[in-house]
Amino acid sequence: MTDIHNHKILILDFGSQYTQLIARRVREVGVFCEIFPHDVAADFIKNYQAKGIILSGGPESVYDSDVKAPEIVFELGVPVLGICYGMQTMVMQHGGEVKGADQSEFGKAIINILNLTNNIFSNMEHEQLVWMSHSDKVTQTGEHFEIIASSTNAPVAAVAHKNKPFFGVQFHPETTHTENGKQIIENFVVNICGCDTLWNIENIIENDIKEIKQKVGTDKVILGLSGGVDSSVVAAILHQAIGDQLTCIFVDTGLLRLNEGDQVMQVFAEHMDINVIRINAKNRFLDALRGICDPEQKRKIIGKLFVDIFDEEAAKIENAKWLAQGTIYSDVIESAGNNQSKAHVIKSHHNVGGLPKEMKLKLLEPLRELFKDEVRKLGLGLGLPYNMLYRHPFPGPGLGVRILGEIKKEYVETLQKADAIFTEELYKHNLYHDVSQAFGVFLPIKSVGVVGDQRRYEYVIALRAVVSIDFMTATWANLPYDFLSLVSNRIVNEVKQVSRVVYDVTGKPPGTIEWE
């Protein structure tokens, strides 16, 4: 079997917002990589046995900061690529000079490649459109580096060591705004570092199945199945690896989208023949949420009750030794970062696969090395439906945070119908995949309307659709007026409890994507 981790790249993170993008681009080329903090121990870097090292960008100024690349990076004899801050600290640590730029540079720029024979720019034209994001610049390269690209505002746009395979770029090749950024990454990872492209879905599936079999043996495994992308892909890979040893527990909270519970059972229990236990807990959730209006309280109640019910059912399964979770690589990175984070909590995170402290189960996380886009591709390779894998994100608490204030059965049913109409029309008009997320929100206020000759005094539905790359920021989707009019008319005419539909035109920031 191919060892998909045999050729790998180590990425040292200096705090850039783009660091995860670097990793995704390296993996798109077909090479495994991992992200670690810039101050990771020297012995760890030495023993990691990377074929190459990438130094990320960062928000600090190298001349004001003690944050440097560990010296071991430059002593191992492996190729190094410094990006933005990574380039600046590499040059400075080799005797160069970095100063604050007269003018910060954020946005697209044209660089002129001075040396096309240099491996980092192989198969590229002299002029390249790139994405700059910096306030400092290299003013002196020192005796060890030479300039291999420049721009109007950044005379030192890229450098190469005269004797060693060390390269630096002031711009960000990992962003899609850099026209041939992927080519630069590929040149470094494949041509310069000599990595074989072993990281592909077929090899990942083969590797995961072997690892699961070795780890689990003949033990039984429990999985909390939510119907979301991550838990669905975990169910599929585990079923292929261990078959009947897997039992999925699907807690139907009653806060899912219209008919979603039935769809989950159809895909997994009927189509894939996976052992799924469906727990109808709708009334328990409604009872627990009665009279609760605060969104944080709702999230915590839903999360705790989910774990309690899952715990009750899991205890009934004899000889279970493992609890599977849909943890993905971005969760691992964020969890490591949050241990040192001082950021305020905007919304509590609802992890529907939480590990109850009382349960004596070992943790199984088959997706913990994969980014979300890789998880989706893995799901396709395992035969899961495209529409299940590429549907919009859905919050852990479900419609519980899309119904403002108190949650009532009538409100849930009303929102489910309205939301289903919105989604159906997005698909019909080929708009669903043009937006990143779209949903309805139930507003517990009534508004006067007229249907036919009858006065109607019913509730309001807000429609929300956004476009986003990373969901850290988002713009509201500029959907056609005719389309919005059609959706509004359908909702008001088909959902008797609604008399008015509005469209949310708030970006993030200042708003959040979800209303609660």
Swiss-Prot record:
Positions of ATP binding: S226, G227, G228, V229, D230, S231, S232
Intrachain disulfide bonds: none
PROSITE patterns in the cross-refs: GATASE_TYPE_1, GMPS_ATP_PPASE
Any Pfam family matching the protein: GMP_synt_C
Any one Gene Ontology molecular-function term assigned to this protein's record: ATP binding
E.C. numbers: 6.3.5.2
Residue ranges constituting the Glutamine amidotransferase type-1 domain according to the UniProt record: 8-198
Function: Catalyzes the synthesis of GMP from XMP.
Protein name, per record: GMP synthase [glutamine-hydrolyzing]
Organism name: Francisella tularensis subsp. holarctica (strain FTNF002-00 / FTA)
